[in-house]
């Protein structure tokens, strides 16, 4: 009877539908919104649907998620989306105004969920989960901090160009190519960051020559970004998330994990009393 009452109580709770951009976003927003569930409400995270040729089909993307709460008259609906550059635009574009001024739209503040998955303080734990080796051979927080400071000047240019509707001078994809890193190893990280810094300076030099009017706005853009909570040390949270994840963080994490696996295997080879024990330990570790 107690269990039945509990089930009925759960059904009586207010259901709030949270529309997200893709299936990949469901778990992230479940983790966030779950903290705000109580005896009076719960959230159900789902992709929006829309009518097409007489039947409902799944909608994808930020626009679809936001339009779902705009077009539906029922209550208890929210949209949960990536901020992309829209938060940083601060109303300079229609998409930014929609994000900032539409009621019941929750966003990441960071560019995307991928940026938050790259949170520097958690990357060592990722390596431990993969390798079962807790040896701190690499300072992820320092790396992400130095990388962020290195790309910050070009990032400010990117925001300035997008705010001025002049992004054709350097699209986000163009910036991605400049701030990409070479194949990393634990022994060439400093050189990699120096090369990124060199590429950043070269691109800024070209932009200053071709767009002196935008160059004059950069100090104001920098100040406005700091007011929004963006700092040179945390630039990575506001870069193109997929590029950051796939072309910067994953290669470095893979490099560190490979080192930790080799280290653990060499340790097993050294400490095993005999070959049978060594094979058993290696088998368990694998």
What is each PLM-predicted segment?
Residues 1-286:
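Acidic, divalent-metal-binding catalytic cores of TOPRIM
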